[in-house]
Amino acid sequence: MAKKADLSVKSERDKYWNDKAVQVFKGRRIVSVRYMGDLEAEENMWSKRGLVLKLDNGMTVIPGMDDEFNDTGVLHYVNAEGQWDCLPSL
């Protein structure tokens, strides 16, 4: 049985979350992209409408403003020329 990560230790916490991100995203393909509707935001008591990404394995990804998902978040990206941009919450 593998040792459970001690998340109070920075190196173990970093490895745990990096491994989790790899498990969730590596090799996945985004099959649809949209902004959530007003009703979806209202049902979650959010003041803004965020992006909704659907992956090829059925998983839905919604950027959040914090770990408690108090509202939707933005998605920053860097293009091939190194220019930063952002897809905002609306």
Identify the meaning behind each predicted range.
Residues 2-90:
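Surface-exposed, interaction-prone regions used to assemble/regulate multi-protein complexes
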